[in-house]
Swiss-Prot record:
Protein known as: DNA-binding protein RFX2
Residue span of region Disordered: 297-337
UniProt biased composition (Low complexity): 315-337
Lineage: Eukaryota, Metazoa, Chordata, Craniata, Vertebrata
Predominant place of localization: nucleus
Name of the gene encoding the protein in the UniProt record: RFX2
Amino acid sequence: MQNSESGSDSPASVALCSSAAAQAPVAQPVTASPQRVLVQAAGSAPKGAQMQPLSLPRVQQVTQQVQPAQHVYPAQLQYVEGGDAVFTNGALRTAYAYNPEPQMYAPSSAASYFEAPGGAQVTVAGSSPPAVPSHSMVGITMDVGGSPIVSSAGAYLIHGGMDGTRHTLAHTSRSSPATLEMAIENLQKSEGITSHKSGLLNSHLQWLLDNYETAEGVSLPRSSLYNHYLRHCQEHKLDPVNAASFGKLIRSVFMGLRTRRLGTRGNSKYHYYGIRLKPDSPLNRLQEDTQYMAMRQQPVHQKPRYRPAQKTDSLGESGSHSSLHSTPEQAMAAQSQHHQQYIDVSHVFPEFPAPDLGSVLLQESITLHDVKALQLAYRRHCEATLDVVMNLQFHYIEKLWLSFWNSKSSSDGPTSLPASDEEPEGAVLPKDKLVSLCKCDPVLRWMRTCDHILYQALVEILIPDVLRPVPSTLTQAIRNFAKSLEGWLTNAMSDFPQQVIQTKVGVVSAFAQTLRRYTSLNHLAQAARAVLQNTSQINQMLSDLNRVDFANVQEQASWVCQCEEGVVQRLEQDFKLTLQQQSSLDQWASWLDNVVTQVLKQHAGSPSFPKAARQFLLKWSFYSSMVIRDLTLRSAASFGSFHLIRLLYDEYMFYLVEHRVAEATGETPIAVMGEFNDLASLSLTLLDKGGCVWALPPVHSGGGGSP
């Protein structure tokens, strides 16, 4: 090949000179049988500059064994066929010659690489690093016609012919090893990353590929990805790169990513569009509080199917639902969209049982048709409540309750809720009929059972996993919702009899208490997770725990709890072993669940099961308080960690026992916890069922042989 200005090409050889006047060979010819060899050429120099021959001492002969896998490496390259000699000439522009066989090119600024069939010995001539022109090429496979070719690793696409300009790369679902090495090379050049960090970068890139994938129509905040990366580095004791370098790293792996600014006005954040967490990634359980703006990865309908009927008192509100979709409410709906990934939107709402009227005589003004109408209306009302909560639009609840419990009287004409598309209108009973129906004890008991089913479903939707990290904004929204429930319901039912109000408020109070407990448990779990991941803290806790005089603890607790000494010793040894193994929070949860199973196994199917479960909670709490007391007196360095762990384990034990009792009695956990609240209004009903499960007995009463 001659220089680029002459425009003539040689079919298979390239000869470069160190100056126009003389040729000084700087390397031995590269000889090989029919194989392709990629050799780095010297950088171009300004025209007219006096070029000096390169001195021989700077030339190095390098013999390498080439792996059989084909790789694409970034470099400024020359293509050489057969056994032709190669010389450098800094005065000439870089030129390429290619034949109809597939060839390799590449844009970037990186070191020299070559490829050849496995087992071949190739001698490469090298020199001091040359200047790399701005139009350097990247390694891509293409044919002479310029048609797109996908490389064997399935990593790239290229469009157009090789004309010395830049070419667009389109990334598919996987990145080849060459992509990772190219990203590291680019970061080393552009960011000045030292060579000893390049090995770490390779693991970071692989971590990206293991946890993220490309997907259309989804996005993640830039800060979300970087925070996940920082957590990864902290857990594996690695030195992270800065945010800017990490952004370049991501784009090197997931090529073609776009950046968008998403979110409500005044609270928008930059997002990467076209990337999401893999469904099986462990990061799905490690979402941080700062990630609450992450977009949902599956579409969920925001608009509730049911809305409170609009008042027609004024002309401005007549015939329009615009007040339900004012700008502030739309903003709240938009924000709630980002929390959908943390709740269970696939929950199936159970069916309600039919009211058991028995031989009860209905009032003259109440008929069986009215009872059936109440069943339909109340089911629809509960479905509307479920839809609103599932869309995290808590402010609609008050409107729904006001609409249902304050419908017009029958003398004022018909009234109804806007129904769904599948059901006819006429779902709201007149208020006088509703009051009369609620005065009937079987109807009130049926309504209370329906409330237990509804509120248990809402708990499982809002907090599907009490140990899974959720954003603090969602937790606070749930707690504010729980705080408002009793006031909203009392206000909506102000005209109803006191017994009806007490029954309804008793159930909703149990629902609110459950939400507060579960959100507190979730908060404790996230705080304890950091402690359990700290090796030094775990070692200190184990050292302090070994100094506790458990024999003295057993002597003091035995009179109160009357537990078997063998059971206590076994729990002590299991606890120390689990702590020594530096178990994760999920492993501790499994251990606690197994403890409950073993202790209550002997009472399974027995009427004494609720009492035994209650006694176990009391004894567990008493023993743990005795251990904390001993640690306090010894001024243990890990007292704070033990206190946090003790709070979490006590709360989680309560959660486990609550569900075991509900399972044993055939009730929902909401019903189990609501029985004490309903005692004042429904004491006779509860006595017929065998007494209140959670009425606490004297602490000195024994039984069960459980710790």
